[in-house]
């Protein structure tokens, strides 16, 4: 049913001329795509692990999986639940980046599941993270942008910078290589959120210059805080201002993400009043992919990534071996065709 709705919407997007209508349809698509998607979580016990921060940033080409590790609505997998996640073998081979989902923005505490899986990196134990795989901690998400709203640490510059000082300790304490700032509708529309998120990133980069900061965004830019971060992170020539390191397109159906690259790569040359006013370098843009995207569509996303010199592909979502699921039809881990597609894409990226 979801696929039929999205197909219908895709046809509509080709027909409508109104930007308001396009924005409305994309908002609805994003809501559908976030079924079970961005949900609730909570705290954890700190555990000292090694950091891999080297200042080198993203791999040349990324295949990143959003893996489900904590959700306060899933019994036994709440943010404070103590359990030991294990990766599938295919995830270790197909991905060079893992996005751990999600940290609750009200607490900004690290779930024990994050700590456990991050600490496994390079140990070669069953289900462990490979030594050369990057770990990105995702903050917020769709549900956590609706509640809490606003995020308390984005209400002032002082609060944002204090939170940056806390987050700057995460690489050494928990072993992450970056953060994914998934501030969506709701808290992302709060009038002070964008400028204070910029203060947060700037302070974070002062303290941890090598920390990766990824900024997800809808295909059509419609969350003001996300757009403010993107506009502050680059200029019209594509030069970096040392804030966000990438933009991830939250367009997950088929290969549709390719249709929205121009909204960011050529933002400065869109129509007058367009929300994005800068040109994001193509090699800083990640294409969104539904977990169960067909291998043929994954191949097209991968070849276009190479042809257009895009950063890579981010996949929503993949369950871990002993974890939980949202809608099974979105789970990459239960579709052999998709798994083969991601393995082949990584082979292409590695050359």
Where do the protein language model's features map onto the residues?
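Extracellular/luminal ectodomains of metazoan preproproteins built from arrays
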Residues: 41, 51-52, 351
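N-terminal, immediately post-signal peptide pro-regions of secreted/luminal proteins
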Residues: 17-45
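Low-complexity intrinsically disordered segments
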Residues: 4-6, 18, 46, 130
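Chitinase-like catalytic core of GlcNAc-active glycosidases
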Residues: 47-271, 282-286, 294-299, 324-331
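Substrate-binding cleft of secreted/luminal carbohydrate-active enzymes
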Residues: 286-351
């Amino acid at each position: 049913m979801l696929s039929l709705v999205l197909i219908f919407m895709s046809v509509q997007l080709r027909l409508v001329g109104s930007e308001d209508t396009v924005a409305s349809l994309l908002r609805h698509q994003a809501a559908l795509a976030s079924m079970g998607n961005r949900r609730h979580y909570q705290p954890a016990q700190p555990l000292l692990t090694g950091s891999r921060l080297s200042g080198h940033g993203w791999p040349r080409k990324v295949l990143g999986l959003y893996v489900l590790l904590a959700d306060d609505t899933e019994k036994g997998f709440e943010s404070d639940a103590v359990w030991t996640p294990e990766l599938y073998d295919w995830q270790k081979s197909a991905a060079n980046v893992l996005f751990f989902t999600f940290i609750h923005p009200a607490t900004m505490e690290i779930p024990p599941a994050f700590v456990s899986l991050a600490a496994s990196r390079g140990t070669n134990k069953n289900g462990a993270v490979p030594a050369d795989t990057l770990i990105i901690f995702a903050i917020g998400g769709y549900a956590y942008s609706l509640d809490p709203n606003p995020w308390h640490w984005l209400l002032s510059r002082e609060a944002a910078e204090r939170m940056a000082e806390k987050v700057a300790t995460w690489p050494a304490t928990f072993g992450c290589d970056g953060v994914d700032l998934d501030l969506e509708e709701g808290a992302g529309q709060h009038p002070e959120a964008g400028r204070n998120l910029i203060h947060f990133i700037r302070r974070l980069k002062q303290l941890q210059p090598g920390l990766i900061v990824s900024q997800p965004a809808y295909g059509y830019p419609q969350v003001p805080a996300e757009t403010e971060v993107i506009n502050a992170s680059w200029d019209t020539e594509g030069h970096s201002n040392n804030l966000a390191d990438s933009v991830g397109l939250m367009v997950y159906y088929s290969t549709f993400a390719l249709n929205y690259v121009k909204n960011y790569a050529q933002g400065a040359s869109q129509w007058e009043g367009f929300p994005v006013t800068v040109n994001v370098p193509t090699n800083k843009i990640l294409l969104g992919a539904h977990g169960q995207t067909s291998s043929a569509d994954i191949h097209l996303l991968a070849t276009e990534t190479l042809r257009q010199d895009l950063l890579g592909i981010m996949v929503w979502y993949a369950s871990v071996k002993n974890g939980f699921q949202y809608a099974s039809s979105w789970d990459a881990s239960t579709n052999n065709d998709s798994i083969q597609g991601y393995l082949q894409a990584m082979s292409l990226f590695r050359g």
